[in-house]
Amino acid sequence: HACTGYKTVLFFCCLLFWAPIMGQKKLADAPKIAPALLIKDLQTLHKILKQNHPSIYWYTPKDSMDFYFSSALASVKDSMSVWAFKNVVASYLAKIKCGHTSVHFSPKLTKQYAKYRFPQFPLQLKVWKDSAVVIGNIYTRDSVLKRGTIITAINQLPIKPLVDSIYGIMSTDGNSINFKSQVLTNNFSSWYKARFGDADSVYQISYIDSAGNSKTSSIAAYVPPKPKKDSLSSTTAAISKPKLPKPAVPKKWTLFIDSSANTAFMRVTSFSGSGLRKFIRQSFRTIKTSGVKNLVVDLRENGGGNIKNSTRLSQYISDHAFKIADSVVASNRGISKVPFSNFFNVVYYALAKSVISKKETDGKFHFKRFEKHYYKPIIKNHFDGSVYILQGGYTFSASTLFTSPLMNQKNITIVGEESGGGYYGNSAMMIPKIKLPHSQLLFRLPLYRLVMDKTRPKGGGVMPDVLVDPSSYAIKQGFDIKLETVKKMIQQKN
């Protein structure tokens, strides 16, 4: 997966770049907050969710959510660091089963906790189902735990319960775990530390060797080397040492025409960005001019973005008029129970809701535009050939809105894994960040629930027409198994 490879390189580059800058401390030394204040934050969070979240009881009934809230309160028995408290909040929010409802450090907290970044778990792992495979190792000379090695346990804890434990503090749409597995893959080291802390100086790694035998190896936690005391020699070294080039950041959107394969390859990693509509328009003009009969749209790295952009891409491919959703509803007209300190964080959203929402007979406040308006196909440079949509666990939010009107179209084939974004619907519209007053944690609060098609079963993601799971062999060999599958399909058809 190109996304996974780039993010692994970027992660380790950041690790090495930040390592020598500041002295590192263990999480156990982080400042603590009194339990009474943390409980107040939980109560504030609970009130805001009950009053404003449109999908708080969509997958989890009220009595269960109340039980999880009581459990969260009970877990705050003593003073806690913000790092530890974040897990309490994350675990509670995860029970809502909404991928757009999550908790994060504020910029101020991120800066404060930079000094607790190390030690770190040294491996990056690709995780799916009950499998984990090495895709990166900070110790590049390690000849044992190298790319493609299957990991079966860490510190004697088997991969499945270990991963399930981390999933407990991650949010996703419904019951699908594919989004969680891809987010975990993108930054395994940080998620491992978030869940299990940094008390270990050495990790026991159980793995399968090249002969298929179960083995165990030790690997040290990564601790950055301390800067040399001789500042003069450090300065001299800094001047004489050539600067390493930063890894090139890949473009958000790319188009490649392979005339020999009669195929256009379009990679869209986000539906955000002011230049996307222009890219889409120019791409389909180029595709039309080239005359290719196959189009591959790669959404495996696409976590969502602007609905107008995803809709525009659908219009160039859909053979029929479509609407975005059967229903788009909010619980109220404004935003209630939010601390006054968040006024500037929410005022825009509250005003926008009051303008676009209309109360209906069901007592909910509806955004009628997306419920009633049908978007017609764009005729000029419309693509009528065979379309292959590549998707995976990180295909989320607006990406599933792009796919939604295309799913039953005869010339469309979805290839890959179940999407991370919901098949039935999501809560992806208008998401302010609310700051909890005592911990200073930020949580994302969706304001609208969007149901794409009320006749669909809820709880899972968009299922592919052709399932292609990850493979330890493909990871070891470094080839893109999903893209190669599509290329073979096109070759066989041609």
Predicted regions and their residues:
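Short, well-ordered alpha-helical microsegments
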Residues: 20, 276, 398-399
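Bacterial Sec-dependent N-terminal signal peptides
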Residues: 1-28, 45
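Conserved acidic, small-residue-rich alpha-beta core segments centered on
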Residues: 149, 307-475
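Flexible, low-complexity junctional segments that flank or bridge functional domains
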Residues: 24-295, 299-329, 423, 428-436, ...
